[in-house]
Every structure is written in structure tokens, then in C-alpha cells.
């Protein structure tokens, strides 16, 4: 019988965690090192009303390094520290995206196997893993538009029931103002002020089901309102997924969806002759059917389609259709190669403006080596 798709995902896509090197293990304390080097060769083409831009690249694709320390107290209690780094690039100087090293995640955890765990620091939230669509690089879903994903958070996760994950997160301010005298240390304009989210996901007995709700508040731009930093006030959103594993076939079919409402605040212009910009709301939703299929041992095929629509009280409407398809193959338990392509078409209608159409095509061949 073929492996279940859940087992494939654990084995193929989380290899870095499963095969991390244990450098210390004594008296209930364990330290692990792991990560991956990942490179992609790609060709992409962007077209907006016949204005074409095309380029090819050989670049970093999410290479990372992590260290994890776990200390068991007994009776199921434990503490854990986790640090993960990534590369960032100044695109004008380093087109290969291998440049400065930055911290992606850094958090501490206190937990109990029966009662759940509390996580504090820069970490993923329940919204990160709600949707089921698979991708390596050109994912057409953007969960952060609906519910803010990873960030500075205090989170609780419960995994005491087989296949069920319950989570809740409180988001803290993400950025501080350092440029304005007298305002240093305050939350930066148009950055996250605070937020809250709750969610649940079930993946057992061939059923996948998940839902998450989040509300994120943003700092108003009250220091220099004539600067065009945006007027975002609050984003309230829902993400959900529903899927089924056909275990004998090695096939998962799923449907991801989301809805969000963004509130923009009224803003008085600095010049008295300029009219006040009124408040308005923007609504968006998407639906995305997808699949993941074990073509043969160590080879998987995956894909999904997305339809997304956005409309605002100001009269602007956007419709996007996107499709992604990919194939991956494990050359070794710690070596993964893949080819992936995506195509997206976006139509935008503004009040009193002509419709514009944008297209984006991308295809890439990648190699990941885990350690």
C-alpha cells in the first residue's frame, strides 16, 4: 500500500527537522542543529498592458540554519529555545540573494505534553499552517492578506488529541519609530500595533479541516499625514481549509478559502485647501481548489488554482486568477529536487479609469540539500 500523503509531507518537506544533527544529549537536555541550502534557477515574465519585463536568475531560495535546545523537567514538562536564520539581499547589489544573515524565528517555549505549550518571541502563528496548498516557491496564496502570519507573538498551542491542533496568538508591535524626534520608541506608523487570532486544524482519519480567525490593528500615521504611508486601520479575516486523503491512491484533494475586511481611517490633509480623505472599507475573498499526489515512491505532483476578488468603497475592483503546478523528487532522504511553475492574471477596474490587465509567469528548477 502506498504511504499516506501526511507521511510524505512529514518525510519530504520537513526533512531538516527530522534529520537535524544532535550535538548534545544528556540528562534530559538535547541540542540539535539543522537547516538546508536551497538554490533555484528560474525564468519569470511580467506583463502589464503590453509592457514586458523578463529576466532569468540563479538565486537562493529560502536557505536556512536553525538550532534547537530542549530540556525535559519530567512529568511531561519541558522548555525549548529555537533560533532560525535566513539570508536577505539588497537586490541591486546581490542578485543571487545570498547576502546578510538575518533572524527569521527566535522564541522560547514552556510546555507539557498533556496540557499544551506557551510560546514567546518571533514565531509562526496558527494562521501560518491553516491552508493545505503545497508550493516550494511561487505560492499563489498569501495568508497574510487575511490573517497576519509569523511575528512577535505570545501563543498557546494544544496538541493533546491525535490529529487536532488548537492555537491562539496575541500579536505585539512589530516595529518602533526611530526617525522622529520625541516619538522614538513609539509604534511606527502603519506597522502592526496589536492583534489576536484563534484557530483549529484537524488532520486524521483521512480528513483535513481547519479554520482560523484574526483581527490585526495598525498604527495610524499621525506624525506626518502628508507622507503617503497608507491609511490602514484594521484587518479582520478568516481562513479555512477542507480536504480528504484518498490513502490507497496517495492523493489529497483540498479547498482553501478566505475572507477579509480592511478598514481605512479618515485623514485630514496638512494643506487646508486639500480635502479630507474619507474613511473606506475594502473587502476581499478567495477560493482555491488543489491537490497533492504521490506519483511514485519519492515523487510527488501538486498544484492548485486560485480565484481572488477585491473591492472597495472607493470603487476600485480587482480580480485575480492564478494557477500553480509542480513536481518534486527525493534523490536522497536529505536531497530534494523540484520543478515548479505559476501563472497569474490580474484585472483592475478603477472608478472612472480604464481597465488594466497584468500577467505574471514564473518557472523554476530547484535543489534543496538538508543537513
From Swiss-Prot:
Keywords, sorted A to Z: Cell outer membrane, Ion transport, Membrane, Porin, Signal, Transmembrane, Transmembrane beta strand, Transport
InterPro entries with a match to the protein in the record: Gram-neg_bact_OMP (IPR050298), Gram_neg_porin_domain (IPR033900), Porin_dom_sf (IPR023614)
Outcome (variant: residue 273 to T): In strain: T2
Domain of life (superkingdom): Bacteria
Quaternary state and interactors: Homotrimer.
Entry's family note: Belongs to the Gram-negative porin family.
Additional record remark: The sequence of strain T1 is shown here.
Function description: Forms pores that allow passive diffusion of small molecules across the outer membrane.
Protein name (database record): Outer membrane protein P2
Organism of origin: Haemophilus influenzae
